[in-house]
Structure formats: structure tokens, C-alpha cells
Amino acid sequence: MTKQQENEQVPGMREQRFGIEIELTGLTRRAAADIIGDYMGTTPVYIGGFYYVYEIPDREGRQWRVVLDNSIKVECKSGIANDEYKVEVVSPICRYPDIPDIQEIVRQLRHGGAIANKSCGIHIHVNATPHNARTLRNITNIMASKEDLIYKALQVEVARKHQYCRPVDETFLDEMNRKKPRNMDEVSLIWYGGRSRRSKHYDKTRYHCLNLHSVFQKGTIEFRLFNSTTHAGKVKAYIHLCLAISYQALIQKCASRRKTTSTNEKYTFRTWLLRLGLIGEEFANTRKHLLEHLDGCIAWKDPAQAERQKERLRARREMEENANQEGKENLEGRDVSNPMTKTGMEEKMEEGKLYVAYGSNLSLTQMRRRCPTARVVGLAELMDYELLFRGRRENAFATIEPKQGSCVPVMIWKIQGDDELALDRYEGYPHL
């Protein structure tokens, strides 16, 4: 198959099929099944069996399931909880437009008393059919390189990290990148370390944040690293993240395994989310939920840049405060009863010069000391320039430099008489 043919078969991010498993307690399996049935307008059917299964058909005839999960520690808001309160909701194979239904089911379950405690998790399965040996190596490297940031962003419980969603296995990672398998059988040999155990449901290799045992057992890539939640927006964010990672693995020629380190986690992770395609208004809440637990500044890569921006904003506020105070003093000193009193515009046009001052280096007090006749007559913006701070700390100074599309807030001072010469000697404050 040529590269072009391979690319033509890759589904878009929103075209991938997926499923979700949500572990909960706080209500019984029967109550959860009834809530889903009420939302779908259908009647749950008790199937029974080892997992005490309830099946609930949706509007398209697909089956939602509510089953027992013995890893859940039960609790309820009132009374005594028993094993009936071990609830796992399993979706059918879903499409991207099904996400709002999944969110509403989560909301209805929360209203019905559902609790997501520390023993509960969420597993998301993405269809593995479009993937091959190369893309599975890509997704392994993507997860290995970003897993430290992902664990922190998702606030994965320490117990879950060490038991049910361990990091990518280093031996598997090394072998995948050293051998570069060409087909799925070769990937299977590396994953299991020998003979395939795909028929075993509870194989020990499944308990990783990226579970490829699921690829060989049921044809899905499983992401196991999410704490369970009854927050519908977070559930949507988790689905978006899994679909985006899977899609990135499909379209990239290769991916680096190198660990991502950063002095500004929030900026680094946000940049990665944008590269994954989680950009624009549609994914605004997704980015919000995935970034809220990370440290750093979202807007600036270098923390020093953020500090300089704060200084620029502080300078602008000081200019505005000085201008307002000067204007207030001018109004208080004006004889408003005299109809011949000059208006502000007329005063600006009388003999003298108008000067522009940027930043806060030349405050009202300093200007008055240099030029006793100085006063603020307005605020403006200097177009196609930017305000920069040169030097470090106590030696820093402000300057403006040309930059297309930018603007610098400035104060307009009025200077008269001999004071013009004093200000002309002060470098950086040109008159208009």
C-alpha cells in the first residue's frame, strides 16, 4: 500500500469510533440502568450472569450495559451500601455526535445519587482498526513522552498510577523503537514478551495508561488513566483527548519518545493540545479542564515574559490614574461660571507643544519637577510600535520600537515656554 493510499484510509479525528466505561458508586446497578432507560425512552433488561448485567437499548438499538466491577469500594449518601452499589456503565460503540448523550447520561446519574470516589476510574476505548504497527509505535512514543504532564494534568491518584494505570513499560518502549515492528504480529510479540495471550481478559499487561492488550483482544486502544467523575464537561474533555492522541498517531510519520520537560507546564501542555488539533471555541472547555491543575502561565513560555507583561499593564494603569487625577485637578481649578473660559480643546491649541510619554518612568511628580507648566491633556495609542523593557531588574528601562500591528498606550502632556528645552533634553520623550 502506498503512503497516499494509507492516508486516504485514515479517518478524521471526529470520524473515529470509541467507547467509554465509567465506574461509579452511590446508587445501585438497577437504579443506574433505570436512569439510562428513562433518558433513552427504553426499558432495561436484566441479563444476569457473572457480572450481573443490565442491558439498555438506545434509540438506535445499540446496547448500553450496567455491570458489576469488584474493584470499586462502595459508598452511598444514606444507608448502608453493598455490592449492588458497584456500578460500571459501559457504552456501545459510539460516534462523535453521541458525546452530548454521554454527557447527559452522566448528569442524570449524578442527579440520581452517583458518586465517583477514589476507587473509580474511566476507561476510553478508541477503534484500533485504522492503526498499524507504525502508528502503534507512534502512540506509544506520544504517551511515553507526555505521560508525566498527562498524569499531573489529570490528577491521577497515586494508587491508581501504581496499580491500574501504570506508565508505559520501558522494556516495551525500548523494543518498539529498536525493532520497529512492521506488522501487528510483531507488535504482539513485543507487547507480551513472547507468545500471545490475547485470549486472556485479565492479562497482567492490561494495567497500563496505554493498554495495547485491548488491541489484540477486542480491537481497541484503551486509555485507562482517568479518575472517574460525574462532571459531564470533564468526561467530554477526556474523550476529546483520547481521540486527538489517536488521530495524531495516525497522521504522524514518526513520534519522539523523549520526555517532555518544562519550566512552564501550563504553556507547554496547552501548546501540545493545540498541535493535537484541540483548537478553537469547540475545544475551549476541554483545554480549560485539562490545564486547570498545571503550574505556570498559559500565555507566556518564559515566566520572565509574564512578569514584563505585568509591568507593562502596571505602567498603563499608572498612566491612566495620573491622567484622571490631572484632569480632575484641571476641572476643579476652572471657573465654570465664566462663559469665556477656554474649553479643553482650545487650551490644547494655545501656544506650546504637546509631548508623548510612554511607560511610567516619567510620572506626574517627575514631570512637574522638570517642567512646572506640564499637565496631562489626554491619553492615546501610538500605532505600529511596541513597548519593550531592556536590561534586568533595577537597571531595566523602557523603550519603544517599530512593530507592525502593535500599539503603545501613551500620555499626552502639554509643555509651555522654557520648559520645552528641559524636556527636549530628556531622551525618549519626543514632542509632537
PLM regions: where:
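Short, conserved phosphate-binding/catalytic loop or strand-edge motifs used
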Residues: 118-122, 126
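C-terminal accessory/tail domains of diverse enzymes
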Residues: 2-115, 129-346
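Short, well-ordered loop/turn elements at secondary-structure boundaries
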Residues: 119, 217, 350-352
